A protein has these predicted regions:
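Solvent-exposed serine/threonine-rich low-complexity stretches and specific carbohydrate-binding patches
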Residues: 225-234, 331, 340-355
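Compositionally biased low-complexity segments at domain edges in trafficked proteins
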Residues: 273-310, 319-321, 399-438
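Zinc-dependent metallopeptidase catalytic helix centered on the HExxH motif
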Residues: 1-46
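A short beta-turn/strand-edge loop motif at beta-sheet boundaries
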Residues: 208-213, 321-329
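Beta/coil-rich, acidic/histidine-enriched accessory regions frequently appended to metallopeptidases
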Residues: 108-294, 299-301, 405, 454, ...
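Exposed aromatic-hydrophobic patches
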Residues: 234-240, 353-363
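Short, aromatic- and glycine-rich surface loops/edge beta-strands on solvent-exposed regions
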Residues: 245-255, 263-265, 364-395
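Active-site-proximal alpha-helical
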Residues: 45-143
Length: 470
């Protein structure tokens, strides 16, 4: 029952196995399991709930940051409960199919994305806002697929009802939910009878507001549009929005393609604020790469992601003890050089006692990245399967407009991009809702990627995928 997706994209080591225990206890004992089970510390539910609320809501911690197995189990229990047991079964069933494919690499299937896909397919709910609230990385493509299919956004009760109203909200919804918590997952209609409403000020951070002016920003519940907000400037104010979580749809720029950093709006019964970072797409997501650093037991301990559109890379260390056999010895490292070969980032990672955290690193065309891993052969992974020289502990990459080129493998970055374009196009063509949508970041990213190609390739690929852009 502990599948290979454990600890992929989120810590589940002593959490996922207990999901089965929770299901057994509550199916056998009903709500009395609060008093006899480990989930709420054998009857100390009030104290557990208070501490979890303090950590998540008041201190703003994410899933990993709470660093408490019980808290993490409660959150995953609430997610599973909203999706339903059939969705949990569907997740395992579909994962077995993936795992039996030739060349299967478990590191390419993080658990947050698996849950977002398979829980959504079964339940019709979009769990992207929940996972993002927990500060877990989620695949933008899967999130867009969820929205395109009209899945309803869902949220923890505590995220859409203020503390002073939680008691009333719990009285309303608890009777219909087996395992109760301030973090039980609900949709907007479940709390609508409370009659709670709030206002929101939306700030649009965009280089040219005229690209959007005169069009509408939409607030949606699944596929249903509940509010149309005329875009008159960079600051929008909306009154009397019922409490809940809403999917946001931003129109396409008139003359340029844009990406949006947030697609969900949370409303509580107060004045709410949301800033949307709307960036012109000059470099497609398809030119980006990610590297996963694995340690003892093949457990991930760090990740590097490039983002040429934002001219940066993000290096995230998630485990303080990558490999105990390498205590006081260099186990991994990253160096980044600018176009003049000046070192602008240098990080060495030993096997133990490593400070965790995230670092943003400047990154532009003509920069160089050097990655060291003492066990590159089987413990340095990439979403680009042919990008790593597994025979060398050090790999050097040059940043080009098409992506990364490994100086020892001599890969052609434009050829690599063509393959990514084909894969992205196939994914769009396989999703009728996205193919027919007038607003799609997947299509915008594909368009920009094709436009960046050399002249001959650009003409070939525009014709090849003209049906996507008609």
């Amino acid at each position: 029952y502990q599948a290979a997706f454990d600890n992929k994209g989120m810590y589940t080591g002593e959490v996922s196995n207990n999901l089965f225990g929770v299901q057994h206890q509550y199916s056998k004992n009903g709500k009395d399991a609060d008093k006899i089970g480990w989930l709420f510390d054998y009857g100390k539910k009030e104290s557990v709930e208070k501490n979890l609320y303090q950590a998540i809501i008041k201190e703003g911690k994410g899933y990993e940051e709470v660093n408490d197995l019980r808290f993490q189990l409660i959150l995953l229990t609430m997610l599973k409960q909203k999706a339903g047991n059939e969705a949990f079964t569907h997740l395992y069933r579909e994962y077995r199919k993936l795992a039996n494919q030739e060349g299967f690499d478990a590191n390419k299937y993080p658990l947050p994305d698996l849950m977002n896909r398979y829980y959504g397919e079964t339940s019709g709910y979009d769990f992207t806002p929940v996972l993002q609230k927990w500060k877990l990385y989620t695949d933008r493509i899967q999130a867009e697929i969820n929205r395109s299919k009209g899945y309803k956004a869902t949220a923890s009760l505590a995220d859409i009802v203020s503390e002073s109203q939680l008691s009333n909200a719990r009285k309303l919804v608890d009777k219909d939910i087996l395992i109760n918590s301030n973090f039980e997952m609900v949709d907007n209609q479940q709390i609508a009878p409370l009659g709670l409403k709030g206002s929101v000020k939306i700030q649009l951070n965009i280089d040219d507001i005229n690209q959007l002016k005169g069009q509408d920003l939409l607030l949606k519940e699944g596929s249903k549009v509940v509010k149309r907000i005329a875009i008159t400037g960079k600051e929008l104010t909306v009154q009397d929005v019922p409490n809940g979580v809403y999917t946001i749809e931003i129109p396409t720029g008139r003359e340029a393609r844009y990406s949006v950093d947030k697609h969900y709006l949370y409303i509580k019964e107060k004045e709410n604020h949301l800033t949307l970072k709307i960036e012109r797409i000059q470099h497609s997501d398809l030119v980006n790469s990610s590297f996963q650093f694995l340690g003892l037991g093949d457990d991930p301990f760090a990740e590097l992601r490039t983002n040429l559109n934002q001219q940066q890379a993000v290096f995230h260390i998630t485990s303080k003890n990558p490999h105990t056999y390498y205590a006081n010895k260099k186990y991994a490292g990253i160096q980044v050089f600018d176009e003049n070969k000046k070192v602008i980032f240098d990080k060495e990672i030993e096997g133990t006692n490593v400070p965790t955290g995230q670092k943003d690193i400047p990154l532009k065309e003509a920069y160089t990245i050097k990655i060291f891993h003492a066990e590159t052969g089987n413990r340095l992974k990439s979403d680009d399967s042919n990008l790593i020289n597994t025979k060398s502990n050090e790999n050097t990459f040059v940043v080009t407009k098409y992506g990364l080129e490994n100086t020892s493998l001599k890969n052609n970055a434009e050829d690599d991009l063509l393959k990514k374009i084909d894969q992205a196009a196939e994914r769009i063509l396989a999703n009728k809702e996205i193919l027919e949508s007038a607003v799609s970041e997947m299509k915008d990213q594909l368009w920009v990627a094709i436009q960046s190609l050399s002249n001959n390739n650009r003409e070939i690929y525009l014709e090849k995928y003209q049906s996507i852009f008609k």
